[in-house]
Each structure stands twice: as structure tokens, then as C-alpha cells.
């Protein structure tokens, strides 16, 4: 079990929050009939019952009311009818009722990540505006949007923005189109007008001692990844064959046993180190810090035993399944600081990518993220509850951290790494299963402080076309790996050596 499918069983009856509105509005030469637009909030429940983005216990009701009120105030010529739906069954039932309700189109707000509601509305043929509630629905928003873009669904339009006024402006397009197949292009024009202009890619200097492609290839053969809680997404075969990395699956019990017997005094010393490093500690006890430190020491001993330099664990599946008893987030953080790889969610593809980056750069592992795209700021935000605070490698400068709970379930210990700004970053996946390098880069510009979703949120202005950055999520999934440095040339040389396809996302 992982957090992507943990909420699959959660359900809530679709309810309606109808704001009374007049069916007519005054417009110039007389009264005209309002357009009727159904607003569908796609989510598990009004109050979130379990761990997922944005977080357990999150109350969506006031957010939905504010959104509906803003749409109604900003588009007085449209009657908005708000409803909730948790998946395709409820979405199809709403569609059936709407056949006799004179509904002209749909706004679908993705409030949780993976609820499949928008698909039914797009299939209706009516114009659909698909909007992301940032740091809440972003995974599904990216993956589902790229699928519709690949299929060139002309009645489908999208907007992801930290400014809800951008959603309101896009909704006004319901009044300006004559046919549903004009909707995508009409909203795209508005979205591009609302997107912040590029601010430039001039970055601070960052010298890196890089391996040659042939030396990198030999180094990869010396690396070994341990997977715990499964074989990893896409499986080990292509990673072994294409990248030369060794992969071994080991049981949860081995890691849990190593945690149990970790030296108590050393655990206290590691906890002391983290306490001194953190500029803030909130909702995490000293006992939990020592528990996390024991997990770090246990993982390090397991790596040593297997002569491995990378470990990836299906963390939440292990914790909720009672297989492990400490969150590994801080341990992963410390391993990455040391130039080893600690990676989340048993994501073998991204773990192998981190191994490739640290071998190329002499220890810059980067970090896995669940990205969010904010068109208002022209930013992609890399969000996760694990990241190093030595972005320039084990011997590089450090940056501040805050120790907080793991965000989605508000348990355990994880961290917010306040990463350096002004530097070029490289974001990739070494997609061995497809013999493809997925690549984009951009300037680190901010650390977003937002309680919803994962703790670390590095904001980057992409080098290139942010619109194009919407197009590959359905093919490669949500995760990306981001490392500091302009690594375009050496990575492209490696891809050519491997005879891989290069896909530039932006």
C-alpha cells in the first residue's frame, strides 16, 4: 500500500451546495438568460479521512464555499451550481441528472489528487475547465491534464494558479465561446496572458567536478539499490540492463530488526545533531527524533551489510502495515547529505535516477518530488517531505532546515529543507523502461511555506516553455528528481552513449 492508492476506498455521498442565484441578468439591451455551469469539487470527503494530499483532517468546506462565491462574484452572468463527487460513479450519476438540467459546461476543481471525476465530464462533450487546488489535487491535475492534451481534447481547458482570480478569468470563457471545441484555445489565451513574464535564467556560479560518460558507466556498475516493500515501480529488469546498477529486494523485517538493535547512545547523538541543525522543531518530540535516528542508523547498517549505496522503502505501506515502526524521512535526509541515496515510496525509477546523479556529480543526490505547477508565478514547485540540506554534495555548503511531522498524516518526523536560491537546477528521470532521458532545468527562486502537502517546496522558474511542461506526466508519472547544477550537457552525453531518446519537457 502507498499513499497514491491508500484513499481509493474512501467515499462520500455527492452533496450539493447550491447558492441561490437569479436565472436572468441585465445586459445592455435587456435581460438575457444566464449560462448554467456545474462546479464539481473532486475529492474524497468534505473533511479528509486519511493521509493524502493536502493532509488528514483537512476541512474543504470553507475552501469550496470561498471558491464558489468568488466564481459567482467574478462571473455574474453565469449561474454556478456546486456539487461534490469522489469518483467516476458519482460523476456519471451527476451527468445523467444534468441531461434535464440545462447545464452548459463544467468547472472541475481537483481537490484531492487521484479522484477520477474530470474524465466523465470531458467525455460529455461540453466545455470543461479543469483547475488545480494547489498542494492538494496537483498529482491528478498534472497526470490527467497531460492525457487530455495528448488526445487533443478541444473541449478541455486547464488552469493551475496560486491566484484564484486566474480561475475566475478562465471561467469567463464560458460566455465567449460559440462551440465547445473553441474552449481549450480560448482559455489557453487567457492563461498565457495571466502567466508571469520570464524573469531570466542568470544564475550564481556553481562549479561541479563531473565524471566522463564512460567513467560514469563504470561507476554505475558498482552501485547497488535495496528495495523494501516491493520490487519498485516498473520493476528492476530495465534498471539493471540499461544502467548497470545492481538491485536487490529485501524484507521489511530486516530494516525493522536493524532499527530495533540500533545503538541507543548513537541514536541520541544523531538526534542531538538534528536538533542543533534545525532552525525550528514543531510537533515532533525528542523521543520521535531518537526513534528516527535509530531508523537512520539501522538503514545505514543494512546498506553496509549488502554493500549497497541506495535504499528505497514503501514507507507508509510499511508503517501502516506494522512492518516498520519509525518514519525514515530524516534518515533518508542524512544519507543523501552523506552522498548515499535514501529514497521514498519504493520508487525504483527515481532511486536509480538519484544514483545516476550522485555518481555523475560526486555526491549530489538531488531529491524526489511531487511537482506542482503555478502559472501565476511561472513556477514549478518540487514538493516532498525528504530533501538533503547539502544541495552541493557532502562537502558543499549547508542550508537551514525545519523538523516537522510527515505532512499528509501529521505523524512521525520529516523536514522542510530551505534550499539555496539563485542557482541552476536540473530535473530528470532516467526512464530505463523506455530508454529515455526526461529533462528540464530552471533557476531556483523561492522556498514556498505552505501547510498543505509535503514540507519541502522548492520553487523553480523553468528554462523554457511552462506550457510544454504540462505534457509528459501521463507517460512518466508524477515523480521527478531535482539536483543542483546545470547538468544538461553531461546528461545528454550519457543519453547518447546509452543510445536513449532525449525528451526536453520545457
Regions found by a protein language model. Name each.
Residues 46-64, 234:
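Glycine- and acidic-residue-enriched helix-capping/strand-helix junction motifs
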Residues 339-446:
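C-terminal catalytic subdomain
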Residues 411-506:
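Extended hydrophobic packing segments that form well-structured cores
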Residues 56-60, 64, 72-145:
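Trp/Phe/Arg-rich N-terminal binding region typifying the photolyase-homology
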Residues 20-43, 53:
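C-terminal segment of N-terminal export signals and the immediately downstream linker at the start
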Residues 75-82, 139-266:
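Cap/lid and interdomain-hinge subdomains that line or gate substrate/regulatory clefts
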Residues 121-144, 152-163, 335-346:
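Short, acidic/small-residue loops that bind anionic groups at enzyme active sites
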Residues 4-27:
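N-terminal export signals
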Amino acid at each position: 500500500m502507498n499513499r497514491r492508492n491508500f484513499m481509493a476506498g474512501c467515499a462520500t455521498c455527492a452533496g450539493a451546495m447550491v447558492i441561490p442565484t437569479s436565472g436572468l441578468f441585465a445586459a445592455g439591451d435587456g435581460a438575457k438568460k444566464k449560462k448554467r455551469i456545474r462546479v464539481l469539487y473532486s475529492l474524497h470527503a468534505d473533511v479528509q479521512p486519511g493521509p493524502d494530499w493536502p493532509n488528514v483532517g483537512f476541512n474543504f468546506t470553507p475552501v469550496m464555499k470561498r471558491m464558489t462565491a468568488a466564481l459567482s462574484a467574478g462571473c455574474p452572468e453565469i449561474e454556478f451550481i456546486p456539487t461534490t463527487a469522489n469518483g467516476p460513479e458519482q460523476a456519471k450519476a451527476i451527468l445523467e441528472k444534468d441531461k434535464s438540467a440545462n447545464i452548459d459546461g463544467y468547472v472541475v476543481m481537483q481537490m484531492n489528487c487521484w479522484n477520477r471525476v474530470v474524465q466523465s465530464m470531458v467525455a460529455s462533450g461540453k466545455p470543461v475547465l479543469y483547475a488545480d487546488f494547489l498542494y492538494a489535487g496537483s498529482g491528478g491535475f498534472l497526470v490527467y491534464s497531460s492525457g487530455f492534451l495528448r488526445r487533443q481534447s478541444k473541449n478541455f481547458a486547464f488552469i493551475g494558479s496560486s491566484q484564484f482570480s486566474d480561475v475566475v478569468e478562465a471561467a469567463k470563457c464560458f460566455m465567449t465561446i460559440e462551440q465547445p471545441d473553441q474552449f481549450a484555445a480560448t482559455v489557453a489565451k487567457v492563461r498565457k496572458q495571466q502567466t508571469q513574464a520570464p524573469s531570466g535564467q542568470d544564475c550564481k556560479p556553481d562549479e561541479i567536478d563531473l565524471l566522463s560518460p564512460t567513467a560514469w558507466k563504470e561507476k554505475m556498475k558498482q552501485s547497488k539499490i535495496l528495495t523494501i516493500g516491493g520490487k519498485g515501480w516498473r520493476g528492476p529488469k530495465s534498471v539493471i540492463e540499461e544502467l548497470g546498477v545492481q538491485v536487490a529486494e529485501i524484507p521489511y523485517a530486516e530494516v525493522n530488526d536493524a532499527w530495533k538493535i540500533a545503538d541507543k547512545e548513537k541514536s541520541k547523538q544523531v538526534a542531538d545533531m538534528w536538533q542543533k541543525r534545525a532552525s525550528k522543531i514543531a510537533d515532533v518530540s525528542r523521543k520521535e527524533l531518537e526513534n528516527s535516528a535509530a531508523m537512520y542508523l539501522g538503514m545505514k547498517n543494512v546498506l553496509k551489510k549488502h554493500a549497497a549505496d541506495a535504499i528505497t522503502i514503501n514507507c507508509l505501506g510499511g508503517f501502516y502495515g506494522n512492518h516498520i515502526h519509525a518514519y525514515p524521512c530524516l534518515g533518508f535526509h542524512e544519507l543523501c547529505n552523506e552522498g548515499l541515496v535514501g529514497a521514498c515510496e519504493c520508487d525504483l525509477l527515481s532511486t536509480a535516477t538519484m544514483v545516476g546523479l550522485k555518481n555523475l556529480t560526486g555526491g549530489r543526490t538531488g531529491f524526489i518530488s511531487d511537482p506542482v505547477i503555478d502559472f501565476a508565478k511561472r513556477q514549478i514547485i518540487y514538493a516532498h517531505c525528504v530533501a538533503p540540506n547539502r544541495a552541493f554534495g557532502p562537502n558543499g555548503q549547508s542550508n537551514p532546515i525545519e523538523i516537522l511531522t510527515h505532512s499528509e498524516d501529521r505523524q512521525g518526523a520529516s523536514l522542510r529543507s530551505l534550499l539555496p536560491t539563485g542557482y541552476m537546477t536540473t530535473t530528470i528521470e532516467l526512464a530505463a523502461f523506455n530508454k529515455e532521458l526526461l529533462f528540464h532545468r530552471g533557476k531556483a527562486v523561492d522556498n514556498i511555506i505552505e501547510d498543505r502537502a509535503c514540507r519541502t517546496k522548492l520553487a523553480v522558474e523553468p528554462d523554457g516553455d511552462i506550457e510544454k511542461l504540462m505534457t509528459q506526466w501521463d507517460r512518466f508519472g508524477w515523480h521527478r528528481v531535482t539536483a543542483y547544477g546545470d547538468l544538461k550537457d553531461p546528461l545528454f552525453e550519457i543519453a547518447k552513449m546509452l543510445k536513449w531518446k532525449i525528451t526536453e519537457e520545457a
